[in-house]
Protein backbone atom coordinates (compact mmCIF):
# COMPACT_ATOMS: atom_id res chain seq x y z
CA UNK A 1 0.00 0.00 0.00
CA UNK A 2 1.41 3.40 -0.92
CA UNK A 3 1.93 6.16 1.63
CA UNK A 4 -0.97 8.18 0.21
CA UNK A 5 -3.35 5.26 0.68
CA UNK A 6 -2.05 4.67 4.20
CA UNK A 7 -2.88 8.29 5.01
CA UNK A 8 -6.37 7.95 3.52
CA UNK A 9 -6.95 4.76 5.50
CA UNK A 10 -5.98 6.24 8.89
CA UNK A 11 -8.65 8.41 10.53
CA UNK A 12 -6.25 10.22 12.87
CA UNK A 13 -3.91 11.16 10.04
CA UNK A 14 -6.87 12.25 7.93
CA UNK A 15 -8.13 14.53 10.70
CA UNK A 16 -4.69 16.07 11.09
CA UNK A 17 -4.39 16.67 7.34
CA UNK A 18 -7.97 17.99 7.16
CA UNK A 19 -7.17 20.76 9.65
CA UNK A 20 -4.80 22.24 7.07
CA UNK A 21 -7.46 22.35 4.29
CA UNK A 22 -10.53 24.48 3.78
CA UNK A 23 -13.99 22.93 3.92
CA UNK A 24 -14.47 23.57 0.19
CA UNK A 25 -11.29 21.66 -0.62
CA UNK A 26 -12.38 18.76 1.59
CA UNK A 27 -15.79 18.64 -0.11
CA UNK A 28 -14.14 18.67 -3.54
CA UNK A 29 -11.87 15.77 -2.50
CA UNK A 30 -14.92 13.92 -1.14
CA UNK A 31 -16.73 14.29 -4.49
CA UNK A 32 -13.71 12.94 -6.37
CA UNK A 33 -13.37 10.03 -3.95
CA UNK A 34 -17.07 9.22 -4.37
CA UNK A 35 -16.62 9.17 -8.16
CA UNK A 36 -13.69 6.76 -7.83
CA UNK A 37 -15.60 4.53 -5.39
CA UNK A 38 -18.67 4.45 -7.67
CA UNK A 39 -16.51 3.54 -10.69
CA UNK A 40 -14.94 0.72 -8.69
CA UNK A 41 -18.35 -0.55 -7.59
CA UNK A 42 -19.52 -0.58 -11.23
CA UNK A 43 -16.40 -2.49 -12.31
CA UNK A 44 -16.88 -5.04 -9.52
CA UNK A 45 -20.57 -5.51 -10.30
CA UNK A 46 -19.81 -5.88 -14.01
CA UNK A 47 -17.14 -8.50 -13.28
CA UNK A 48 -19.58 -10.35 -11.02
CA UNK A 49 -22.25 -10.22 -13.74
CA UNK A 50 -19.78 -11.69 -16.26
CA UNK A 51 -18.94 -14.52 -13.86
CA UNK A 52 -22.64 -15.24 -13.30
CA UNK A 53 -23.30 -15.20 -17.07
CA UNK A 54 -20.43 -17.60 -17.68
CA UNK A 55 -21.68 -19.91 -14.92
CA UNK A 56 -25.19 -19.79 -16.38
CA UNK A 57 -23.88 -20.67 -19.86
CA UNK A 58 -21.80 -23.54 -18.48
CA UNK A 59 -24.84 -24.91 -16.68
CA UNK A 60 -26.91 -24.54 -19.87
CA UNK A 61 -24.30 -26.42 -21.94
CA UNK A 62 -24.08 -29.11 -19.27
CA UNK A 63 -27.84 -29.59 -19.43
CA UNK A 64 -27.69 -29.73 -23.24
CA UNK A 65 -25.02 -32.44 -23.07
CA UNK A 66 -27.05 -34.48 -20.60
CA UNK A 67 -30.16 -34.06 -22.77
CA UNK A 68 -28.19 -35.45 -25.73
CA UNK A 69 -27.04 -38.40 -23.63
CA UNK A 70 -23.44 -37.28 -23.20
CA UNK A 71 -21.85 -37.37 -19.77
CA UNK A 72 -19.84 -34.12 -19.24
CA UNK A 73 -17.04 -36.14 -17.59
CA UNK A 74 -16.84 -38.31 -20.69
CA UNK A 75 -16.39 -35.19 -22.81
CA UNK A 76 -13.66 -33.89 -20.50
CA UNK A 77 -11.83 -37.22 -20.64
CA UNK A 78 -12.04 -37.26 -24.43
CA UNK A 79 -10.66 -33.71 -24.58
CA UNK A 80 -7.82 -34.65 -22.20
CA UNK A 81 -6.83 -37.58 -24.42
CA UNK A 82 -6.87 -35.33 -27.50
CA UNK A 83 -4.82 -32.69 -25.72
CA UNK A 84 -2.30 -35.27 -24.47
CA UNK A 85 -1.85 -36.59 -28.01
CA UNK A 86 -1.32 -33.07 -29.33
CA UNK A 87 1.46 -32.21 -26.88
CA UNK A 88 4.98 -32.33 -28.17
CA UNK A 89 6.84 -35.51 -27.46
CA UNK A 90 10.57 -35.58 -26.88
CA UNK A 91 12.50 -36.16 -30.04
CA UNK A 92 14.73 -39.17 -30.26
CA UNK A 93 18.41 -38.72 -29.51
CA UNK A 94 20.51 -38.25 -32.61
CA UNK A 95 22.81 -41.12 -33.48
CA UNK A 96 26.55 -40.58 -33.16
CA UNK A 97 28.20 -39.47 -36.37
CA UNK A 98 31.84 -39.01 -35.42
CA UNK A 99 34.29 -41.05 -33.36
CA UNK A 100 37.45 -39.76 -31.67
CA UNK A 101 39.90 -40.57 -28.87
CA UNK A 102 40.09 -37.99 -26.08
CA UNK A 103 43.12 -36.89 -24.00
CA UNK A 104 42.62 -39.81 -21.58
CA UNK A 105 42.75 -42.37 -24.38
CA UNK A 106 39.02 -43.12 -24.20
CA UNK A 107 37.01 -43.59 -27.38
CA UNK A 108 34.15 -41.09 -27.56
CA UNK A 109 31.45 -40.23 -30.08
CA UNK A 110 29.89 -36.97 -31.18
CA UNK A 111 26.61 -36.38 -33.02
CA UNK A 112 27.86 -33.38 -34.95
CA UNK A 113 25.62 -31.01 -33.03
CA UNK A 114 26.69 -28.53 -30.42
CA UNK A 115 30.26 -27.48 -29.79
CA UNK A 116 32.96 -29.35 -31.58
CA UNK A 117 34.95 -31.44 -29.09
CA UNK A 118 38.34 -29.91 -28.31
CA UNK A 119 40.24 -32.96 -29.59
CA UNK A 120 38.55 -32.79 -33.02
CA UNK A 121 38.90 -29.02 -33.19
CA UNK A 122 42.61 -29.23 -32.35
CA UNK A 123 43.21 -31.99 -34.93
CA UNK A 124 41.48 -29.97 -37.66
CA UNK A 125 43.32 -26.74 -36.87
CA UNK A 126 46.81 -28.03 -36.06
CA UNK A 127 47.14 -31.36 -37.87
CA UNK A 128 45.20 -30.38 -40.99
CA UNK A 129 42.69 -33.21 -40.63
CA UNK A 130 39.14 -32.86 -41.90
CA UNK A 131 35.90 -33.69 -40.14
CA UNK A 132 35.46 -36.61 -42.55
CA UNK A 133 38.47 -38.29 -40.93
CA UNK A 134 36.41 -38.79 -37.77
CA UNK A 135 33.30 -40.30 -39.41
CA UNK A 136 32.08 -43.60 -37.98
From Swiss-Prot:
Keywords: Coiled coil, Cytoplasm, DNA-binding, Repressor, Transcription, Transcription regulation. One of its GO terms (cellular component) is protein-DNA complex. The keyword Chaperone does not apply. Residues 113-118 bind DNA. It is found in: Cytoplasm, Nucleoid. GO terms for molecular function: bent DNA binding; DNA-binding transcription repressor activity; minor groove of adenine-thymine-rich DNA binding; protein dimerization activity; structural constituent of chromatin; transcription cis-regulatory region binding. The keyword Cytoplasm applies. Residues 13-67 form a coiled coil. It comes from the Bacteria. InterPro entries: H-NS-like_N, H-NS_C_dom, H-NS_C_dom_sf, Histone_HNS, Histone_HNS_N. A DNA-binding protein implicated in transcriptional repression and chromosome organization and compaction. Binds nucleation sites in AT-rich DNA and bridges them, forming higher-order nucleoprotein complexes and condensing the chromosome. As many horizontally transferred genes are AT-rich, it plays a central role in silencing foreign genes. A subset of genes are repressed by H-NS in association with YmoA. Complements a number of hns deficiencies in E.coli; represses the bgl operon, represses hemolysin expression. Belongs to the histone-like protein H-NS family. Interacts with YmoA in the absence of DNA. Homodimer that oligomerizes on DNA into higher-order complexes that form bridges between disparate regions of DNA compacting it. Interacts with YmoA. This is DNA-binding protein H-NS. It comes from Yersinia enterocolitica. The lineage of its organism: Bacteria, Pseudomonadati, Pseudomonadota, Gammaproteobacteria, Enterobacterales.
